[in-house]
């Protein structure tokens, strides 16, 4: 058995599960991680049976600051060499920013931000030693969009993640390491239900919603091609192009129109 593995966070559903499935279909061993152990166990069994690869899992919550170190220790105990790192774990917060607690926001930052940095930092030295590494950070078109007061930190964190991915490419490409920021738009997953925004998702036109399977395939293909940024589908490529050329004043107005009633009532 090869000891080379792809580590996929947030692998129990949605884009993470589809990325794990697509990687397994390419004959790559997978280490799954997410909070829901039963789902991980079932997915591991299904993937290993379907694609004849080794699939293992470790249940953990990336809002726990020790989780990245626990994952690394697990890999070392099994002699797993992680040469593909998929930073996918994430969620949304529906509550307006001024109504959330600081603990809510700190947890949010740990899952979407700090854990990505920590996992990348932990596994990077081994990738440098092996002169080989593929990193994906599942970001969002929200990185290019005006922020809303419902998810005030979501877009800014994704913008930071895109720049962090750029930094990895600039500093470590000479070591055989590339990083890809995958920036999908509206994707049909459990994300919107678990984040309490399914009603808003239902109002999105069908031509702007895409399957997690398609997003995963485009993202993984871009990662193996060494692309720095992947915006899946022509629909969102065009949207991002518009967002980049619009003046900041127009983007701010657009953001206010997307904000909850406290703006729209004025």
Predicted regions: what they are:
Residues 12-14:
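Conserved glycine-rich cofactor-binding loop
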Residues 26-43:
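Conserved glycine-rich Rossmann-like NAD(P)H-binding loop of the short-chain dehydrogenase/reductase
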Residues 88-93:
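Conserved NAD(P)H cofactor-binding loop of Rossmann-fold oxidoreductase domains
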Residues 96-98, 104-109:
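Substrate-binding pocket helix/loop in short-chain dehydrogenase/reductase
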Residues 120, 156-157:
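Active-site helix of classical SDR
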Residues 140:
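Residue(s) in the substrate-gating loop at a strand-loop-helix junction
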Residues 181, 202-239:
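C-terminal helical subdomain
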């Amino acid at each position: 058995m090869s000891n080379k593995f792809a580590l996929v966070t947030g692998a129990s559903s949605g884009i993470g599960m589809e990325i794990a499935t697509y990687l397994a279909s390419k004959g790559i061993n997978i280490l799954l991680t997410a909070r829901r152990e039963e789902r991980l166990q079932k997915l591991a069994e299904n993937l290993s049976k379907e694609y004849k690869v080794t699939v293992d899992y470790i249940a953990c919550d990336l809002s726990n600051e020790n989780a990245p170190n626990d994952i690394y220790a697990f890999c070392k105990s099994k002699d797993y060499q992680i040469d593909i790192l998929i930073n996918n774990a994430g969620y949304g917060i529906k509550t307006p920013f001024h109504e959330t607690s600081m603990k809510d926001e700190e947890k949010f930052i740990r899952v979407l931000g700090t854990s990505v940095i920590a996992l990348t930092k932990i596994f990077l030295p081994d990738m440098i030693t092996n002169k080989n590494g593929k990193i994906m950070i599942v970001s969002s078109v929200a990185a290019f969009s005006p922020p809303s007061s419902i998810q005030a930190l979501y877009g800014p964190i994704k913008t930071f993640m895109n720049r962090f991915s750029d930094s990895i490419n600039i500093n470590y490409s000479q070591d055989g390491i590339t990083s890809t920021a995958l920036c999908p738009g509206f994707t049909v997953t459990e994300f919107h239900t678990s984040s309490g925004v399914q009603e808003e998702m239902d109002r999105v036109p069908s031509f702007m919603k895409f399957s997690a399977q398609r997003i995963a395939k485009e993202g993984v293909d871009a990662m193996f091609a060494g692309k720095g940024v992947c915006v899946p589908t022509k629909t969102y490529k065009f949207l991002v192009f518009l967002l980049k050329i619009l003046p900041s004043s127009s983007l701010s107005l657009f953001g206010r129109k997307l904000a909850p009633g406290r703006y729209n009532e004025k």
